[in-house]
Amino acid sequence: MAKDYVTGKRTHFGNTRSHALNHSRRSWKANLQKVRILVDGKPKKVWVSARTLKSGKVTRV
């Protein structure tokens, strides 16, 4: 399972509830994108969330 290289964000699991309080398992997936960034001066392909890209915590190569 992929996770954000910078923040460690990954898929979360829980339940969805109906009005009758029935439940079934579901997952919330992070919006991960595979991008090339500089790691120790060398380009590397890593999974990064869209929020991390928008915030400017990493820059593409």
Curated annotation (Swiss-Prot):
It comes from the Bacteria. The keyword Protein biosynthesis does not apply. Residues 1-26 are annotated as: Disordered. Belongs to the bacterial ribosomal protein bL28 family. One of its GO terms (biological process) is translation. The keyword Ribosomal protein applies. This is Large ribosomal subunit protein bL28. The gene is rpmB. GO terms for cellular component: ribonucleoprotein complex; ribosome. SUPFAM superfamilies: L28p-like (SSF143800). Keywords: Ribonucleoprotein, Ribosomal protein. InterPro entries: Bacterial_rp_bL28, Ribosomal_bL28, Ribosomal_bL28/bL31-like_sf, Ribosomal_bL28_bact-type, Ribosomal_bL28_sf. GO terms for molecular function: structural constituent of ribosome. It holds the Pfam family Ribosomal_L28. PANTHER family: 50S RIBOSOMAL PROTEIN L28 (PTHR39080), LARGE RIBOSOMAL SUBUNIT PROTEIN BL28A (PTHR39080:SF1). Gene3D superfamilies: Ribosomal protein L28/L24. It comes from Lactiplantibacillus plantarum (strain ATCC BAA-793 / NCIMB 8826 / WCFS1) (Lactobacillus plantarum).
